[in-house]
């Protein structure tokens, strides 16, 4: 049961990061503020989940 809860929490966290980056067009500093986490924490979580800020930047 704990494993299921951990997976659900990780997926929710990953989705929140993606939504924040989408809302800020890939600006990590703004996304960190939006999520109320330290910039370094966001950077480490992005690396953990394989999320690149460039995916969310407008060309």
Language model feature labels by segment:
Residues 1-59:
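Bacterial C-terminal helix-turn-helix
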């Amino acid at each position: 049961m704990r494993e299921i809860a951990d997976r659900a929490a990780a997926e929710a966290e990953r989705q929140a990061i993606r939504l924040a980056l989408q809302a800020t067009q890939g600006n990590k500093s703004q996304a960190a503020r939006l999520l109320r986490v330290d910039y370094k924490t966001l950077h480490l979580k992005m690396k953990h989940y394989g999320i690149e800020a460039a995916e969310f930047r407008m060309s």
